[in-house]
């Protein structure tokens, strides 16, 4: 009786059946597919049956830091792809640090991509951890991988796509990825007929002045870029995706965000300033800029759930002094991220959300600016707000107390306001706590919960 047959009845020291040993090889390989390759290889010491089983796992998930020598890493990938070369490959995940001394050899990646395309790979995830060298240009064969479902690339350069056939591609993440020409990205997006999720993280030097995202199937779009106030550019992002449900924008450099036929967005995460800054300030006389901001706000006005940053609120506040804001009638959940800006622009936006039920104030960093804390003029009641949570620990500063007062004194049906005190403030016999609890409340059923 061989060792596997001896082990299959019961686990050591237990009365439970060892079901793992009863599983067929094909199912074990599917289980191992979910582990990093370095851990999969370790199973080879379990028994004779497991000795070569890892070689049949239909996927590779490897980091060059798993190897002491970079050449060993390269040889391992070569050997793995050569073994059982006629079988299909479900995933190919590779992370490497492309140092200068390895440059000649790292171009093997192009050959590996050609190989896995012929093996009908479904998921490609390649990360150049040197982050921004763009040494490696992937071959054009990647554009004709008809089995490909997800493509995630970081720090690489893509060839200009002359022909694209990606009928199965649903997810594409391009992180600090460059194209051989400025039309390459637009062409690639347009030629993916079932693309549902697109994430683009841009570098300050990608040289794409106008990025057009045109997709009839896209449901989720994320656009992120590093911020550099010293860069004054007329960059444009134009989005034409009528089925879009989720939108995340985090880019202070782009001057114009254009939403064409936005459909009905459900959720958005917005941190943009339309390239406005302390140097390049909002100009009420710049009518094209005002029109663009107005159309953008109208485009996102259908959302139900939104995260918005104080930098964006400041632009909205400046815009509101020229024009009336559109109503966000569907918005029921709002999370506001404050970073170093006064909250005085918040009431203006809240009053444009007539059906808002939940407000979360996160990471607020309040600033004192004299006594002019509340916006001048009468404020409208918040007739729908039911729940408020202030996540930043309060210290009792005037700005904080004004925020709490505004919410309690203007919310007609507020049920609960949750906050917490800073560790430097003792809850017992706290003057701040007494002040908070003494604030008049418009809603008779509201509770203040101090965590």
UniProtKB/Swiss-Prot annotation:
Span of domain F-box: 17-70
Extent of the LRR repeats: 128-155, 177-202, 224-251, 335-363
Disulphides: none
Key words, A-Z: Leucine-rich repeat, Repeat
InterPro entries for this protein: F-box-like_dom_sf (IPR036047), F-box_AtFBL13-like (IPR053781), F-box_dom (IPR001810), FBD (IPR006566), FBL13/AtMIF1-like (IPR050232), LRR_dom_sf (IPR032675), LRR_FXL15/At3g58940/PEG3-like (IPR055411)
Domain FBD: 370-421
Key word Repeat present: yes
PROSITE patterns according to UniProt: FBOX (PS50181)
This protein's name: F-box/LRR-repeat protein 13
Source species: Arabidopsis thaliana
Gene: FBL13
């Amino acid at each position: 009786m061989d060792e596997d047959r001896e082990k299959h009845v019961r686990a050591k020291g237990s009365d439970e059946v060892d079901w793992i040993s009863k599983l067929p090889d094909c199912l074990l390989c599917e289980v191992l597919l979910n582990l990093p390759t370095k851990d999969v290889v370790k199973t080879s010491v379990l028994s004779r049956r497991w000795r070569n089983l890892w070689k049949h796992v239909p996927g590779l998930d490897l980091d060059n830091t798993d190897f002491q020598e970079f050449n060993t890493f390269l040889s391992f990938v070569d050997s793995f792809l050569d073994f059982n070369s006629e079988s299909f490959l479900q995933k190919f995940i590779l992370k490497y640090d492309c140092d200068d001394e390895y440059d000649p050899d790292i171009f093997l990646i192009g050959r590996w991509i050609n190989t896995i395309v012929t093996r009908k790979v479904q998921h490609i995830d390649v990360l150049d951890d040197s982050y921004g060298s763009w040494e490696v240009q992937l071959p054009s064969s990647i554009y004709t991988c008809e089995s490909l479902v997800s493509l995630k690339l970081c720090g690489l350069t893509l060839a200009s796509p002359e022909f694209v056939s990606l009928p199965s591609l649903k997810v594409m993440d391009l992180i600090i990825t460059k194209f051989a020409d400025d039309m390459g990205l637009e062409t690639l997006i347009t030629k993916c007929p079932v693309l549902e999720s697109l994430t683009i993280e841009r570098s300050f030097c990608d040289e794409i002045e106008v990025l057009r995202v045109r997709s009839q199937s896209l449901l989720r779009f994320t656009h992120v870029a590093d911020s550099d106030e010293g860069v004054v550019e007329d960059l444009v992002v134009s989005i034409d995706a009528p089925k879009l449900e989720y939108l995340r924008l985090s880019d202070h450099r782009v001057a114009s965000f254009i939403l064409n036929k936005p459909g009905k967005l459900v959720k958005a995460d917005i941190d943009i300033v339309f390239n406005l800054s302390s140097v390049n300030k909002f100009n009420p006389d710049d009518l094209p800029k005002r029109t663009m901001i107005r159309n953008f706000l109208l485009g996102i006005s259908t959302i139900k759930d939104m995260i918005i940053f104080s930098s964006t609120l400041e632009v909205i506040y400046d815009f509101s002094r020229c024009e009336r804001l559109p109503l966000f009638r569907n918005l029921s959940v709002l999370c506001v991220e404050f970073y170093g800006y006064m909250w005085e622009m918040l009431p203006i936006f809240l009053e444009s959300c007539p059906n808002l039920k939940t407000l979360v104030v996160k990471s607020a960093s309040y600033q004192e600016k004299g006594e002019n804390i509340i916006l001048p003029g009468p404020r409208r009641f918040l007739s729908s707000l039911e729940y408020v949570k202030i996540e930043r620990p309060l210290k009792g500063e005037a700005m904080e107390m004004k925020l709490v007062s505004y919410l309690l004194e203007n919310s007609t049906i507020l049920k609960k306001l949750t906050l917490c005190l800073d560790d430097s403030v003792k809850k017992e016999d706290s003057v701040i706590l007494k002040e908070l609890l003494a604030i008049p409340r418009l809603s008779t059923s509201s509770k203040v919960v101090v965590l």
